[in-house]
Amino acid sequence: MTTTTAGKVNLLGLTQPQLEQFFESIGEKRFRAGQVMKWIHHFGVDDFDAMTNVGKALREKLKASAEIRGPEIVSQDISADGTRKWVVRVASGSCVETVYIPQGGRGTLCVSSQAGCALDCSFCSTGKQGFNSDLTAAEVIGQVWIANKSFGTVPAKIDRAITNVVMMGMGEPLLNFDNVVAAMNIMMDDLGYGISKRKVTLSTSGVVPMIDKLGEVIDVSLALSLHAPNDELRNKLVPINKKYPLGMLLDACRRYISRLGEKRVLTVEYTLLKDVNDQPEHAEQMIALLKDTPCKINLIPFNPFPHSGYERPSNNAIRRFQDMLHKGGFNVTVRTTRGDDIDAACGQLVGQVMDRTRRSERYIAVRQLAESESAANRN
């Protein structure tokens, strides 16, 4: 359980079983967990005195041993298209970004999992910031909590603005595994936000051992940040591919999807970069690569940021690529750029990373994870 500098337990990031354990640890009945969890997530409460069905003696006990603390809101911007972006400060001192995208009757919240990112994908502005820290479970779910309160949609399940959550913000979610899984469990819990497992999506650049582990502990939708149809190009665009090449990666994704059943499919994300990965031969390679993978493809025209070195393809090039994939038998959509006027579009999230020296440490951790997994498989 996460404790603050004051030694108090932050209840915001606790799952229902963890809350039950907490109440037992302070000599209370387990059913109190459900009462308090509803107050936190359905009503956005951060003051124990507001919990009217909790007795005064217990409220005083909670004040002494616990708190409800989300990230600090630094700023909120609203795009001309209705997209919202929150910049929030986490305990490390860094700022991360959360984006809400309204579209039709759906509202999707894009949530960050780390302050910065160690994977250094060449077309992503977050990776250029380096890596600072993993977010705690409270800091991950706290982004949902903050957004929900900002819309005034409490209780959370009445006229809810947030219908979908995607772990596609800053960071690689599978490198902050335990905290992200805890937060997603709260998202799906009826005592939390009651979001369907089909509407909670985790996006990964491809940490293969953790994809397999994810399938063992939770049932959420999976998205793969592919961005290249062959290993040579993907090694340049998504460096973690050197550790987990495409054959290994897609095998892991297929194993994950097969566990889910229910006609679930992998979402493949592909950022289109002018004259880099948008040519007809790339579409042909992609058709061959994904022919045995149940998937839908989401094409993302590159969203420029300073000094990236990349450009957005022309509309004709985007349509040509989409048409070729359609003819190859795939369900293909082109993501509409949203929120670019407030730097909230895909690939533009940067936040403010206070310590940019840890990228190499995170790569070492990835390598050690792969080596230990390989040793386990040999045994």
From Swiss-Prot:
Biological classification of the source: Bacteria, Pseudomonadati, Pseudomonadota, Gammaproteobacteria, Pseudomonadales
Swiss-Prot/TrEMBL catalytic activity: adenosine(2503) in 23S rRNA + 2 reduced [2Fe-2S]-[ferredoxin] + 2 S-adenosyl-L-methionine = 2-methyladenosine(2503) in 23S rRNA + 5'-deoxyadenosine + L-methionine + 2 oxidized [2Fe-2S]-[ferredoxin] + S-adenosyl-L-homocysteine; adenosine(37) in tRNA + 2 reduced [2Fe-2S]-[ferredoxin] + 2 S-adenosyl-L-methionine = 2-methyladenosine(37) in tRNA + 5'-deoxyadenosine + L-methionine + 2 oxidized [2Fe-2S]-[ferredoxin] + S-adenosyl-L-homocysteine
Name of encoding gene: rlmN
Entry's localization field: Cytoplasm
EC nos: 2.1.1.192
Any GO MF annotation of the entry: tRNA binding
Enzyme class: transferase
Record protein name field: Dual-specificity RNA methyltransferase RlmN
The keyword Nucleus is annotated on this UniProt entry: no
Gene3D superfamilies: 1.10.150.530, Aldolase class I
